[in-house]
């Protein structure tokens, strides 16, 4: 496990518009936007020197009160990152966040190992627990076990690249002597944890390489960093370094 920056530090990026259309955030022009517009935003972010673009993840948005602020357009993160990766050169490609419980960890390892292989290791696997209970129900996944599923998924994805054939025996997933490839050339896939509370901060310290603040104010950062470091120490990771993936909001200058 390793941070992207040698000593750990802040990286700045944005979740491009268009690929996700929550009602509260989408602007009218996005309704008619095309993949070419999405690409233009990503290439502009690269030209401006941003560190990453981030693509969100929802699979089956329910028609209920909780999800009433969500539309049904959410581009698949793996397909979208692959497409953007083929049309950019240096900007990193982040899932922000992949809801780990929705996919078997071997599938996640295969998808993101392939992305890393195809994009000169520009991929960051950002993972989270998820929050839309109706979506879990639609997929037949126990919403109340999402934290445990996330923890085991992180461990299993890391382990998938440890050798040519690997085995895993956990409470949620079990398999023996299977190979996953291609793997990242370095043998390591950066994994960032996203979330808005102390559970995500502690999970970062115990298992992650970086943290994605989601809705955190700047004055919370000292507490977040202290919690990550304490959790890392308690997990025997005192020497670990961590990145922070910061996504400021965007502002339009002129017409989109």
Question: Where are the model-predicted features located?
Answer:
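Conserved beta-strand positions in the central sheet of alpha/beta enzyme cores
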Residues: 13, 54, 126, 212-213
